Amino acid sequence: MNSGSRIELLSPRLANQIAAGEVVERPASVIKELLENSIDSGAKRIDVDVEQGGVKLLRVRDDGSGISSDDLPLALARHATSKIRDLEDLERVMSLGFRGEALASISSVARLTLTSRTRDADQAWQVETEGRDMAPRVQPAAHPVGTSVEVRDLFFNTPARRKFLKAEKTEFDHLQEVIKRLALARFDVAFHLRHNGKTILSLHEAHDDAARARRVSAICGAGFLEQALPIEIERNGLRLWGWVGLPTFSRSQADLQYFFVNGRAVRDKLVAHAVRQAYRDVLFNGRHPTFVLFFEVDPSVVDVNVHPTKHEVRFRDGRMVHDFLYGTLHRTLGDVRPDDQLSAPIVTAVVRPSGPEAGEFGPQGEMSLAANLLQSPQPQPSYTAPGSGSGAGYQYQYTPRPQSAVPVAEAQAAYREFFAPLPGAEPGAPVALPEGGGDIPPLGYALAQLKGIYILAENAHGLVLVDMHAAHERIMYERLKIAMASEGLSGQPLLVPESLAVSQREADCAEEHHSVFQKLGFELQRLGPETLAIRQIPALLKQAEANRLVADVLADLMEYGTSDRIQAHINELLGTMACHGAIRANRRLALPEMNGLLRDMENTERSGQCNHGRPTWTQMGLDDLDKLFLRGR
């Protein structure tokens, strides 16, 4: 800073251009602000015309309430808005826009024309501005009820900003993504998009479930809904509904993730963490889940005014929101069974609370879920495999038992015993399915074993292929988790306590969450303003670096109010135990053993994926088999 320069007020033009740097980054930023204004005006149809990716032209026309001629100049002024009057309004704001600076910022870096007409006006009025001329010119115009905003030559007066724009296709892709997000947020509004004269999107109003499903399919692709779980739950003033993709429908990029808070699309670290936790055990490494979720909460407990573009929000009780999201998604994914995945065309697994305590998860959400499952086992159907002829087959009846809380060692021993060779076991004959397809379990009955690796089974839909090691590994893993939940986390005292240097804020956090650390098997003591002593760590993690583990947990607690680091480490150990305890490749199984494994899969959470996220089974329908052999052509 030049010591001789004096402090001066910035010109309105320069001030708006500085503000535009925060609000207007690219054409997609402009379309977001214009569409939000249209939605706030009560529009039921919005038409968008774009040329050259939005750099040459952006035109948005709506059938909303319109703007009166007296208010038109104010619409282009900074900090002028019709949406809030005082701080109380700001704290409970439900409109998408409220700051009153978007149009002023846009008009400072582009040529803007705003035309509008209210329902009780005899004619429309138009106002024009350019970046170099901030004085608006108002004149009569012809226009139906509603508003049109035309933005031409974006960044024409700021060449440096224009240089940072990408290729036309890239800019249009960003712009189209904004429209898709808003179209998902508002099913009651029709959206039509044209680019260089070509229709790209034409989405009509959606007022029923079928219409909403069509819109989601149009935006996310038909494959998403076919591989998605509908979800809806409301508890303690929080409501979550929408669709979550099955783990098998994951993506290499996080490009099919839509989360809305009170109708506003947001990208929030707390939400991302909760979703990542829920999918932790079922996603292959490096893959990303898919979801379209709508979260509704009292607007007074969420702050939407924490980011210039309003992409981020802050919850008053982030811990409660995190646990609610994680618990709901975790239960939904855990409730998926093979018969759900075979449902067509859409898997249905709507989560509803079963009582006043339903859906409540504490700091150890996953372990609380396991405890709930232990306390209230659900009855399961019994399947009886009919013989294939007198003396030619076998009678096999399987009644699934509730998963009981047994010590980890006993759980492994029981499974080793279960899969020990049966005395005098013979391969036997495959079971013939009953005519009419009645009483056939979802994964059917085993036919044979291939190379000691895969189980071939027949169900009502056709052929089922099962990776027996991966499937058994998941069953073992889930049972070990339940056993661990019942036993709890025992602590291992350290012979020599370890000293950990932390910030004062981290030390305060450790004291505040003392009970959380105790439940995790830690014993911490504060020795000074910025020093902690680690006196005990979880017994299962005695080989881990205690200092690093505690530091990571503290970082999570300060960021999210909860931590899954310990559970992740423990799950990794249990996964290793399950892998070593599972049946190996080239192990020959008798048909009763194969069928026993299939029945266990049907009654085990997340049995569709192994511990590493790979699929454990796949279905080949008769149509798929016919295509292989060109039948019917």
UniProtKB/Swiss-Prot annotation:
A Pfam family it matches: MutL_C
SMART domains associated with the record: DNA_mis_repair, MutL_C
GO biological process: mismatch repair
Keyword DNA repair: yes
Residues of the signal peptide: none
Record's function text: This protein is involved in the repair of mismatches in DNA. It is required for dam-dependent methyl-directed DNA mismatch repair. May act as a 'molecular matchmaker', a protein that promotes the formation of a stable complex between two or more DNA-binding proteins in an ATP-dependent manner without itself being part of a final effector complex.
Family that this chain belongs to: Belongs to the DNA mismatch repair MutL/HexB family.
Name of protein: DNA mismatch repair protein MutL
Organism: Pseudomonas fluorescens (strain SBW25)
Organism ancestry: Bacteria, Pseudomonadati, Pseudomonadota, Gammaproteobacteria, Pseudomonadales
